Amino acid sequence: KAIEDKEAEFGRIELQDVTTQWGVFALAGPKARDVLRDVINDPDPATVLSNKRFPWLSARQIELGMCPVNAIRVAYTGELGWELHHPMEMQNYLFDLLEKAGAKHGMKLVGARAQNWLRQEKSYRAFGTELGRDATPLEADLPRFVDLSKEFHGKAAMEALGVRVKCCTLLIDGPDDADPWGREAL
């Protein structure tokens, strides 16, 4: 739908689905930087992953071992971390490389449910759960990502709607083994 909306403005738009050509690993936790530092190919491995050279929400092309990676400095768990987007044909190689490097740092594998639980604990939103085309950034409680002092596409429409509902995080005292899915009824 978004592409159709923009075609009138920009002319012909061509879309190519490369979903099956790329994989992604999420590496997160207090020692994520140490794991990457052990396998990164860079003239200055000591500082290439520093907060100054690779700040939060930035993206860079790096090389881990022999694998080209589009790295994004973000972790859905709210911890120090990176998303490591890589060619699918390199996935097994990269997994083995990271697993070996991570072993000496105590790295453990976690699944999507654990990651989902951790992101909710940090009040991170997910498309298809808390977020969708029906909620504005202000309704999703994401004001830090919207600068209302600047002009942007959709600003007038968002302001005209106002805040009809608001997504918020509730802390519930209850059983220790209750894993949230998101959008639970209260």
Language model segments and positions:
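Conserved, structured C-terminal
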Residues: K1-L186
